[in-house]
Curated annotation (Swiss-Prot):
Source organism, top-level taxon: Bacteria
Signal peptide: none
GO CC aspect terms: plasma membrane
Keywords attached to this entry: Cell inner membrane, Cell membrane, Membrane, Transmembrane, Transmembrane helix
Pfam families: UPF0259
Membrane topology: Multi-pass membrane protein
NCBIfam families tied to this protein: PRK02868.1
Organism this protein belongs to: Serratia proteamaculans (strain 568)
Transmembrane segments: 23-43, 87-107, 132-152, 156-176, 192-212, 222-242
Name of this chain's protein: UPF0259 membrane protein Spro_2675
Subcellular location: Cell inner membrane
Family of this protein: Belongs to the UPF0259 family.
């Protein structure tokens, strides 16, 4: 029986609806951890003032590319910008690892008939987190490089690597073995993976647009809300990819 996108969408939404409470708690918890880590590792207010003091200069160079703007910064400004970027990247990576590990564990255990909370899902995924951390770091780095050089290679790599976390968590395969198998399966089943990935990307952009217009929220609260909603979208994609991989294995 051929695998159809409609069947996968229906199964994914049913699982998402039935486990909404646990998934929502997992999305909020990992969002809070991400924002907390970002706050902890970001430069302090005095250092950030170094960047804000030259805000007028940045506005005047709006027509320039990012590389030209960075080259015009002083060494102090470049160092502060590097710290801000590193804090944001590290916190997002840790949050994504916890979300992916916890979500895949939740899906697997619920599929086996067990009831599990968000905290227990993260705890049960602990043995897999180091491997997932390395996997997501490599995949994120390659995708970002592809997007920076030219958008299309980054999108293609995102699609190719989409099944790698599921393979790693489910079959306990190594990082590179998971990436290799993911590329093979993703391209062979592009007709059901590409639409889901495009919907995921569109939903993420929609969430970003919506939250950016909620001016009543403080920056920290807005960050938690944005990250939590983004995590919910990613959780739904993980359910879809997990279900797809289970069908491909059978």
């Amino acid at each position: 029986m051929p695998i159809t996108a409609n069947t996968l969408y229906r199964d994914s939404f049913n699982f998402f609806r039935n486990q909404l409470t646990s998934i929502l708690m997992l999305a909020l918890l990992t969002a809070f951890i991400s924002v907390l880590l970002n706050q902890a590792f970001s430069p302090d207010v005095e250092q950030l003032k170094i960047l804000s003091a030259t805000e007028g200069d940045f506005a005047a160079s709006a027509g320039m590319g990012i590389q030209e703007i960075i080259q015009q910064m002083t060494p102090e400004q470049q160092m502060v910008l590097l710290k801000v970027s590193a804090a944001a990247t590290f916190s997002a990576l840790v949050g994504n690892v916890l979300l992916v590990g916890g979500m895949l564990t939740l899906i697997r255990l619920v599929s086996q008939g067990q009831r599990i909370s968000a905290l227990r899902a993260i705890g049960a995924s602990a043995p897999e987190l180091p491997r997932l951390l390395l996997l997501l770091f490599i995949c994120t780095l390659l995708i970002q490089l592809g997007l920076t050089l030219f958008v299309v290679p980054g999108v293609i790599m995102a699609i190719a690597f989409s099944l790698a976390p599921v393979i790693t968590a489910t079959d306990k395969k190594g990082v590179f073995a998971s990436i290799k198998l993911s590329c093979k399966l993703a391209f062979a089943n592009a007709r059901v993976i590409v639409p889901a990935m495009m919907l995921w990307l569109a939903a993420k952009l929609l969430v970003l647009f919506m939250v950016s217009h909620l001016s009543v929220l403080t920056p920290n609260v807005a960050s938690v809300v944005l990250t939590a909603l983004s995590n919910l979208v990613s959780a739904l994609l993980l359910i879809y990819l997990f279900r797809l991989y289970m069908l491909l294995r059978s």
